[in-house]
Amino acid sequence: MAFIEVGGCRYPRVTLKWRDIIGAGGVGSLEESRALVCPSMITEGYLLDVFEEDGERYVRTFASYQTSDEAAFADRNCIPFSVLDRQSRRDVELALMFMNHEG
């Protein structure tokens, strides 16, 4: 599994596919309203962690980082686990096992 090491921790590279929410604030016809669909999104970067809050799991990722001074992360996302597609859910679980494996 491809990964980077920052601050002594391994962060695996992931590609996550998920469904985003879309909204339209203005007035629209029935036809325009029915045309609203959730777009399929792709996030590429590194898995920071997975956490649970109020019984819901979330995935945190980052795409940019610095190693000078102390570890810091940028281009960060927090995605509800429930909007990930099936393969991305599997990939996150494999990445977590990789992160937790001493090596």
Language-model features, listed with the residues they occupy:
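Conserved RNA-binding domains used in RNP assembly and mRNA/RNA metabolism
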Residues: A2-G103
